Amino acid sequence: MDSFYIICFVLFFLPTLVFLYFTVVRKNAFEERLALFRPTHKLSQKREAYRQQVRKYSKYAKIILLVIFYLPLCVLIAILLKEEYEKTGILNILSIYDDIKMILLSVYMPVLLLHYLLFYVIKRNEKAQHMLLEQMSDADFELLLKVKDSLLFTTKYNPPFVLCNNKLYIFIFFVIKEIDPTQITDLDWSYRRNDIYVEFKAPEKIIFTLPKKVLPHFLQIIEKYTNQKIYY
């Protein structure tokens, strides 16, 4: 059984550890600036209202993740305790079989890491939007609002990209890419169910997904900065 525990642990733990490294430890230039960012400017009423909605979205996302991660564990432990109590008449979590304890430990140690990783990403994206809200022009902010209105209710305040002072910021799960939109070449996209896979070079290759309704806003940015006419 020891080898089974090790296999379970490795299968769940290693992928999470890899994502943790690329998301939390390894940072690009923008993310290093973001780590040092402290709010310095008072936002306008509209921008502050948007930021408050981002905070509310982040709070709800964290609550939902807590329920998803830990409710199954609580239910499972309750079932195991009930079964043990019916057998022995003793209500004690330590009385659960060692094999079951090891399986729970093998699964939920990686879950704890995944919990930390997702909470980090939510907090990082919230902070990034605050930083960009301070720096962007009024036209950039109006574009951000248009993108928000094109997103589903559950993702309205989690934009896949933000334009700020002639820089394009792509929000991918484990990284935020800062791109000069004038350098974008080899743009291509394909439809996959409800999303669109977008691929381009700037100069490195980047692939990410967009909701269908958001694609026109993204392509308008490309047209503006590359002087290309794009038909879609």
Provide a role label for each language-model segment.
Residues 177-180, 195-197:
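Domain-scale macromolecular recognition modules
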Residues 122-177:
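Conserved beta-hairpin
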